[in-house]
Regions:
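Core catalytic lobe of class I
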Residues: 1-239
Length: 239
């Protein structure tokens, strides 16, 4: 690779992507900027209009496709603000025939709407680079009383609790995602010693889970605090 494995870079992700070799990554997961217009403690989530946001994402998505192996997959997490625009971009760049799933993550926590149904889910777009992609079927506990104690194939709606403020897993970074969410993705779309990449690393959950599951990784965030938190969490894996 044109970059080191098992390292977290503090830089513009487009610049890092341009340095990476073709066909060098097995799985990409990115919890992208949702374009909420909010300024969080750790980052500014404002890319302008949805169209301006897509102009910003497009060169990055093109590079992500280039570095992905033919057997690789990409998961992009967003919400209602960008999902429709992002789906069109991904259909154009990764091709409609390589769309696999739109996963709904139902998380439960959050505010309630006064003049709307409460918004309690994120969208995760799952695309492959080709039809020869890695996929390990995942199972979950059956909910029917008749099938109690049995397993069933996982569906595309994932009911996983978000991390509450008192949870041991919470590390104090805005929009931190739960490990269970990343375990499902990484187990399904990679094998041991594969390379996992995250170019919006944030709290570092994706890389921590990758390391716990015996995968190599490469991460990037433009925020130094995100990189520092991620490196600290990675150092604690296995201790």
């Amino acid at each position: 690779m044109g970059t080191e494995l098992n390292k977290v870079y503090c830089m513009d992700n487009l610049e890092l992507l341009k340095q990476m070799d073709d066909n060098s990554v097995d799985l990409i997961y990115c919890d992208i900027l949702y374009n909420t217009g909010r300024k969080f403690k750790d980052y500014d989530d404002n890319l302008g209009t949805p169209q301006q946001a897509m102009e910003w994402y497009r060169p990055r998505l093109i590079e992500m496709r280039r570095i992905l192996k033919d057997t690789g997959s990409i998961y992009l997490q967003c919400d209602y603000r960008l999902i429709h625009y992002l789906k069109i971009e991904m259909d154009n760049i990764f091709k409609v025939e390589n769309f696999i799933n739109e996963i709904i993550w139902k998380y439960g926590l959050g505010g309630s709407g006064k003049k709307s149904f409460s918004k309690k889910h994120d969208n995760i777009l799952f695309y492959s680079k080709s039809k020869d992609y890695i996929f390990n079927i995942q199972y979950e506990d059956a909910t029917s009383n008749k099938l109690k104690g049995c397993k069933k194939k996982m569906i595309d709606v994932w009911d996983i609790a978000n991390i509450n403020n008192m949870a041991k897993e919470r590390i104090g970074y805005d929009t931190q995602k739960p490990k269970e969410l990343l375990r499902r993705i990484i187990k399904a779309s990679s094998n041991k010693n594969d390379v996992i990449a995250d170019f919006f690393v944030g709290s570092g959950t994706s890389l921590v889970v990758a390391k716990e599951l015996g995968r190599d990784y490469i991460g990037c965030d433009i925020n130094q605090r995100a990189v520092d938190i991620t490196n600290k969490r990675l150092e604690e894996v296995g201790k």
